[in-house]
Every structure is written in C-alpha cells, then in structure tokens.
C-alpha cells in the first residue's frame, strides 16, 4: 500500500488526508504546530493517524509521496531532506485534481485574487452550475472531491500553492497582476516570484484559456518572452472592453475592481454563461470581507477594514479609492516591502499614519524621511503615531481623526506578528471599532 504523508493539518492538509484515506492509501498527518479541534475530530472520524507539536522523521521520511501545506517553505530542513532522497512533494490541489474530471477555473495574482475568485463563483452559481469554491478560500478542494464532487471549481491559488504543482492543468487560468510580494520566500529575487505565478499556465493547450491583464508591465514583459500553449484573452483599459454593463453599474467600486470585473466577465464568457446572467451578477455581487469593508461611522468618521491588504500594492489600491482625508493604520510582519510605492498617495491622502506592529523600525525609518522632506514644503506635515498593538492603534486613530475623515486599516504587511491570520486581524479591528 502506497504511503502518503501530509505535512500541515489545516484546511488543505486535512482535506488531502481524508481524500488519500478514501482512495486506499496508508496516510499519516504531521503538524509541528497544534492541530485545531475541528481538524482533529475530522481526522479521527476518518481513521487518519496524526501527530502535532513535532515532525517525527522516522514516520515521514518513509513516505512514497508527501502533500505539503503551502505555508511550509521549501527551505525547511525536513523538506530539504525529503528532496535530497527524491521523495515527490506536491500540493493539496495537485493531489485532489487526480481524482476529479471537473473543469478548473484558477485565479492568481498579487492582488485581487479573493475578490475575483468570489465574483466568478457568484456568477457561476447565479447561472445554476454545480460549482465549488476552493484554494485559499472556501473548503479544501480535496475534501470537496472526496465528499461532494462538483462539475466546476473556482480556485484561488497563491504562489506557494503553484510551487508544488506539476501535472495539474487549469482549464481557465487567470493572472491578475504581479507586484513584489512574499520576496522573503523567494530568496528576495523578484523573478523567482514571477516564475511561480506563471506556473498557472503550466500544461495548458489550445483548448484551455489564459486570461491576463495586458497593461501589467511585468506580465507584458513575460508574455513577450514566453511561448504559451493556451488560447490568450488579454483584458485592460487599452483593449476592447468585455464588460456588459457600464463601470457606474458595477457593484464593486474602484479602478482595480473594474479590472477584476473584466477578468471575471471573460472567464464567465469562456465557460458559456449567458450575457444577462453576467450582467445581473456584476450589478448585485456583495464583495469580500476584509477587503475595503465598511465597518461603521463613529462621530462622523468612517472606519474601513482592509486587513486583506498584506502587501504594499494592495494598500496602494485602497488609498487610491479614498475620497476624504485619511488616517492610515499599517504595520505587521514585513515581507521585504518597498513602501516608496505608496509615498505619493500617502502625501496626497493621509494626515496621520498609525503604526501597529511588533517591529515598526522599517516603517519609522521610511516614513520618518517622508515627513522630514515635507516640513519645508507644507504647513502641517503628516503626523506619525507608533503603537505595538491593535487596541492602542485604534485609540490613536480615533483621537487623530476629525469629522468627515476616514480611518483605513490597510496594513501593507502579513498579520503573523500579532494575529492568527488577516481575518483574525480584521475581526479584532472591527470589534475594537464597534466598542468606540
């Protein structure tokens, strides 16, 4: 009996273990953290052996194949040992795709993935298709394949998931944009990250579709260099507009969301969804939690939760959509960020910056210089307030904001210094705002 070891027992790892067990493999799950109670119960119910708090090498190195959580870097010593002995290491998506004939609509990019994935899923649901939502959102693809296989899957893919995909093929692949992100995981080499993103086109043929933003300079450069097998569908403001509604009628506001809506429209067209269904869906889609999410108005100040902005480019889009004077809360685990990308918008839109994190040194250094350069030019330079937790950050923003202002949480950084996830950060922020 072939032995499958699953490293990491979160949503994707637990799902992969259940599917592997169902397919008759000898399965073992190992997580160096603590496996949460719901996943422990799921593994126990399905008779899957597991351990947590450690990786027992004698139970792992004898695997015929390893399914790795996307959160474990390829540089981890255990992964290096497995690679050195030639053990195949794959992602949960790669594993699950072997056991379904469903059409795969896959979305990647540095920003806009969750919004675009959710919008495409919504359009397909409105059209009455039997469709599942998987990848970074929704339930694990493997668990859905095991328990309730669908005809279509709309899958949000990070670069980490794409790293360990080899034979998987997207019927429809969408690449939204590429800006520097996660460089700490790619030896601080931007091209390594770019190459990971383009893995979404791997194994595609003329029967498959590749939808991409034509005006993204990095994508444009790569498209001139690469010979891709798929049928190409570029979109943007300089190519024919695929939208069946005017920009004003779109439920999602902001220039970046016009682009996301274009990508979703082309995907729906490729799948064969009727134009009237697409039109209605674009007008009625509700958006995504923690992405420019309105929280409350307190004493005339609007509070916006954009906790999903885990990189500088996401924050750029958030600031671009601000129409009133802004207090920006930012900070967290830095991933090799270049904050100069938002200097112009910070100058234009913000009167106060509130840093929230355990390591604000890089923020202080960068934006301190920006404020110094302002002093000779403007009457009131930007105010900087340094905090090391969310409660103090919200209180500082509350006292700095005036009636008619907006307080925007758009951290530019990962959440793992103070929070479990960006969702946890967003939930705690909204709770703190509602208590004001």
Residue positions per predicted region:
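Phosphate-binding loop of NTP-binding sites
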Residues: 21-22, 57-63, 70-214, 218-230, ...
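C-terminal helical cap/extension that packs against the catalytic core
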Residues: 39-41, 340-404
């Amino acid at each position: 009996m072939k032995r499958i070891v699953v490293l990491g027992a979160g949503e994707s790892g637990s799902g992969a273990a259940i599917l592997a067990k169902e397919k008759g493999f000898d399965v073992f799950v190992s997580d160096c953290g603590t496996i949460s109670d719901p996943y422990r119960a799921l593994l126990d119910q399905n008779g899957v052996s597991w351990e947590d708090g450690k990786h027992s090498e004698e139970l792992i190195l004898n695997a015929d194949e390893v399914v790795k959580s996307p959160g474990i870097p390829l540089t981890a010593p255990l992964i290096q040992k497995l690679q050195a002995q030639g053990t195949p290491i794959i992602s949960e998506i790669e594993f699950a795709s072997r056991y379904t004939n469903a059409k795969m609509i896959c979305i990647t990019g540095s920003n806009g993935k969750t919004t675009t994935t959710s919008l495409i899923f919504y359009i397909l649901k409105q059209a009455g298709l039997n469709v599942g939502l998987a990848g970074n959102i929704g339930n694990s693809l493997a668990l859905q394949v095991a328990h309730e296989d669908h005809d279509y899957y709309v899958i949000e893919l990070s670069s980490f998931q794409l790293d360990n995909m080899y034979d998987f093929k997207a019927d429809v692949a969408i690449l939204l944009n590429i800006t520097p992100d996660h460089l700490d995981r790619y030896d601080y080499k931007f091209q390594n990250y770019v190459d990971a993103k383009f893995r979404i086109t791997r194994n595609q043929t003329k029967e498959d579709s590749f939808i991409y933003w034509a005006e993204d300079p990095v994508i444009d450069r790569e498209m001139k260099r690469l010979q891709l097998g798929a049928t190409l569908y570029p979109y943007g403001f300089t190519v024919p507009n695929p939208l069946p509604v005017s920009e004003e009628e779109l439920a999602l506001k902001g220039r970046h969301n016009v682009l996301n809506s274009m990508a979703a429209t082309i995907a729906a067209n490729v799948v064969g969804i009727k134009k009237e269904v697409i039109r209605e869906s674009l007008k009625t889609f509700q958006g995504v939690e923690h992405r420019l999410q309105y929280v409350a108005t307190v004493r005339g100040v609007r509070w916006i939760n954009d906790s999903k902005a885990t990189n500088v480019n996401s924050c750029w889009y958030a600031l671009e959509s601000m129409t009133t004077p802004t207090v920006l809360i930012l900070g967290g685990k830095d991933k090799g960020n270049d904050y100069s990308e938002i200097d112009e918008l910070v100058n234009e839109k913000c009167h106060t910056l509130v840093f929230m994190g355990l390591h604000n040194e890089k923020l202080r250094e960068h934006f301190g210089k920006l404020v110094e350069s302002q002093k000779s030019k403007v009457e009131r330079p930007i105010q900087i307030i340094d905090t090391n937790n969310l409660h103090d950050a919200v209180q500082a923003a509350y006292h700095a904001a005036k009636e008619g202002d907006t307080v925007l949480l758009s951290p530019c950084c990962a959440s793992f210094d103070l929070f479990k996830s960006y969702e946890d950060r967003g939930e705690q922020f909204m709770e703190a705002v509602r208590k004001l």
